[in-house]
Design a protein with these regions (language model features):
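Internal alpha-helical scaffold of NAD(P)-dependent oxidoreductase catalytic cores
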Residues: 105, 109-120, 136-173, 186-223
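Small-residue helix-packing motif on alpha-helices
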Residues: 34, 61, 77, 202-210, ...
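Short pre-catalytic strand/loop immediately N-terminal to key active-site residues, enriched for Gly-Thr
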Residues: 122, 171-176, 228-233
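NAD(P)+-binding Rossmann beta1-loop-alpha1 motif at the extreme N-terminus of oxidoreductases
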Residues: 1-56, 60-63, 197-199
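Rossmann-like NAD(P)(H) cofactor-binding subdomain of soluble oxidoreductases
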Residues: 50, 58-70, 74-139
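NAD(P)-dependent Rossmann-like dehydrogenase/reductase catalytic/cofactor-binding core
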Residues: 2, 211-274
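Hydrophobic residues within alpha-helices
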Residues: 19-20, 84, 192
């Protein structure tokens, strides 16, 4: 595309920096092809240490980057979009990582005489495990994004976890099943560890056993392609310890409670988007 940078980041807090590190580590782009716009000293220091170009001028970054990641909070994005609007052309991709901000609202904010209705916009929702390279990101794209664009975008987000393109209408569901659910999983790990501590295990060991078991079980689901119920059944011997524990969890309402939690988070996301 003839610009200085393949990738530009506006906003380099914890999430933005984690995404930037993942993309650099993947080897898809050299650090000389990456830029960041950051107005706060702490953020500037973080990205300068990575060896990428840093500016405080959002307009400059937008003008000189092929793909622009907006990793800022919604209220900050309202300020940033007008700053970059007149520096964009129709072959650039703008990726919004602001929670609850729709594609149409980004398009509206970027509307100008030169690029009216032609800007390529992506809405992204990564979750916090992206901070350790194990994120799950939902991506929704507008009508101007090509299949080739999708491949590029997916490759960047796969650098710090996994990514899927979904209809924007499912973004609230993504909030429930992916965005909010790390908190639910942490509660499950904590509860398992509490039980182990109650039975005599040290707290440090209990967290390690519980967390690694969750990680391994999740890997089994992803790598085997087996139904979670089938994997559960394979661990349950007739009259054994596991089926005894499963029955106790069923009696306690584990399934309906988890379902209620995911649906409550989904509904809250819908309510906040109105």
């Amino acid at each position: 595309m003839g610009r200085k940078f393949k990738v530009g980041f506006i906003g380099c807090g914890n999430m933005g920096t984690a995404m930037l590190k993942g993309i650099l580590a993947s080897g898809q782009v050299d650090k000389s092809q990456v830029a960041a716009a950051e107005k706060f000293e702490a953020g500037r220091k973080r990205v300068e240490d990575l060896g990428v170009y840093v500016t405080s001028d959002n307009g400059e970054l937008a003008r000189e980057s092929d793909v622009i990641f907006l990793v800022v909070k919604p209220y900050q994005q309202e300020e940033v979009l007008p700053e970059i609007r007149d520096n964009l052309s129709v072959d650039q991709i703008v990726i919004s990582v602001a929670a609850g901000v729709s594609i149409s609202s980004v398009e509206q904010a970027l509307m100008s005489i030169d690029v009216a209705g032609k800007i390529k916009v992506v809405r992204a929702m990564p979750n916090t495990p992206a901070l350790v390279g194990e994120g799950m990101t939902a991506l929704s794209v507008n009508a101007n994004i090509t299949k080739e664009d999708e491949e590029v975008i997916l490759s960047y987000f796969n650098a710090f976890g996994k990514a899927e393109i979904v209809p924007e209408s499912l973004m609230d569901v993504v909030t429930g099943v992916s965005g909010s659910s790390p908190a639910f999983v942490y509660m499950f790990i904590e509860a398992m560890a509490d039980a182990a501590v109650a039975e005599g295990m040290t707290r440090a060991q209990a967290y390690k056993f519980a967390a690694q078991t969750v990680r391994g079980s999740a890997t089994m689901v992803l790598e085997t392609g087996e139904h979670p119920g089938a994997l559960k059944d394979a661990v349950c011997s007739p009259g054994g310890t596991t089926i005894e524990g499963v029955c106790a969890l069923e009696d306690g309402g584990l399934r309906p409670t988890v379902i209620d939690g995911v649906r409550a988070a989904t509904q809250k996301s819908r309510d906040m988007s109105k």
